């Protein structure tokens, strides 16, 4: 019976990971202005907020049957979906108010919003005229926000049977929603890469940029690097960076019988080999963890570190630049947060420099990894 339940759960998890549509991305060349000032960042931010708010408002007109069909699911958790929508509306309102602070410098997409009712009203009638300066962006943006919203609604619909970053289980968990405006944190999963590899390039690149990130390592991958190159090389690899843990293998920790041992073994290895870089953070692969795991993490002094901006760089359907463009669009929408890349993906060699160049003059801040 236990084996049957295990395989049943794994089939459900695999179905959740494989979303029915390709990940959403938005060609940023359709936006006619470069983000060369904080005010121009705000213009683009206001536009993305209104476009997403419009998509969110439209989704609320769907009844349960229509929503199931749209998400490609037979059963959905309406309560979690409703909670997600409420949180999204609250964040959209806060973000729009922040983005409007520069309206005296550029009034594009500045509308009267003094609360939730007026935001919903503006979202309902939001459209781009055919002769607008921004018309080339209008349809690609509409498609992006609908697809991105569906990604999020689908995760909420499956929660908590299939856990993900869409919802927190308790105080031992965090994501990027509480960060300050215009502040972002870089995180990288599933490393270190094989030697030599993307992790080596990435940590060197970050040091040259005087930046730091949190790397969530797999115990087996770290052990391979340790066996091949030794302790000093592993310490040099992560110099100036932070290292959290992601378990011994990149697999779901929600239905794995040895999930606790996976975390304990990896934590012990990292503390022993690179103690000066260790931070007490666990990043669950796929965002999947047990609903009752809070006590374990508290006892171990670990925080579950989730994210709210996903690069989707493991998707074969997205190029490196498309992954970076997705991240930038979500940075404009959410205005702060934890960005999740994978340092085992070669795409990051192109995606990260593109992202940093595109935002270099936009007044953003990058959180020091030790603050995460």
Question: Model-derived features: where do they sit?
Answer:
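Short, intrinsically disordered/low-complexity patches at protein termini
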Residues: 267-269, 329-330, 364, 372
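Charged/polar, solvent-exposed surface patches and flexible loops
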Residues: 51, 83, 87, 94, ...
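Alpha-helical, coiled-coil/dimerization segments enriched in small aliphatic residues
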Residues: 189-190
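Terminal accessory/targeting
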Residues: 2-186, 197, 204-213, 335-372
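Short, composition-biased local secondary-structure segments
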Residues: 160-177, 197, 253-271, 325-327
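Active-site-adjacent pocket scaffolds in enzyme catalytic domains
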Residues: 20-47, 291, 296-334
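Metal-dependent polysaccharide deacetylase catalytic core of the NodB/CE4 family, i.e.
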Residues: 116, 120-122, 128, 132-136, ...
């Amino acid at each position: 019976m236990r084996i049957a339940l295990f395989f049943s759960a794994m089939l459900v998890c695999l179905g959740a990971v494989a979303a029915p549509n390709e990940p959403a991305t938005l060609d940023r060349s359709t936006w006619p202005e470069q983000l060369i000032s904080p005010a121009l960042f705000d213009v683009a931010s206001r536009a993305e907020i209104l476009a997403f708010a419009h998509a969110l408002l439209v989704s609320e007109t769907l009844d349960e049957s229509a929503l199931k069909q749209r998400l490609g699911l037979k059963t959905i958790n309406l309560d979690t979906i409703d909670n997600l929508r409420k949180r999204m509306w609250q964040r959209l309102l806060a973000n729009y108010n922040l983005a409007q602070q520069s309206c005296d410098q550029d009034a594009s997409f500045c509308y009267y919003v003094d609360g939730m009712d007026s935001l919903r009203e503006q979202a309902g009638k939001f459209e781009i005229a055919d002769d607008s300066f921004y018309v080339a962006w209008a349809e690609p943006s509409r498609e992006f926000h609908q697809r991105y919203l569906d990604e999020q609604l689908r995760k909420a619909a499956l929660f908590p049977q299939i856990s993900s970053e869409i919802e927190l289980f308790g105080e031992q968990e965090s994501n990027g929603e509480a960060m300050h405006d215009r502040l972002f944190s870089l995180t990288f999963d599933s490393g270190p890469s094989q030697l030599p590899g993307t992790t080596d390039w990435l940590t060197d690149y970050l040091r040259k940029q005087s930046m730091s990130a949190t790397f969530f390592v797999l115990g087996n991958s770290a052990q391979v690097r340790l066996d091949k190159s030794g302790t000093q090389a592993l310490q040099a690899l992560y110099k100036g960076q932070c290292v959290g843990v992601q378990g011994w293998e990149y697999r779901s920790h929600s239905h794995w019988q040895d999930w606790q041992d996976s975390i304990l073994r990896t934590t012990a290895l990292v503390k022993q080999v690179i103690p000066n870089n260790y931070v007490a953070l666990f990043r669950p692969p796929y965002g999947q963890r047990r609903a009752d795991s809070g006590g374990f993490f508290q006892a171990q002094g670990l925080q579950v570190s989730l994210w709210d901006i996903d690069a989707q760089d493991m998707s074969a359907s997205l190029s490196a630049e498309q992954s970076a463009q997705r991240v930038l669009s979500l940075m404009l929408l959410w205005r702060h947060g934890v960005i999740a890349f994978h340092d085992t993906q070669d795409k990051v060699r192109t995606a990260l420099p593109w992202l940093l160049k595109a935002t270099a003059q936009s007044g953003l801040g990058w959180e020091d990894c030790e603050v995460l």
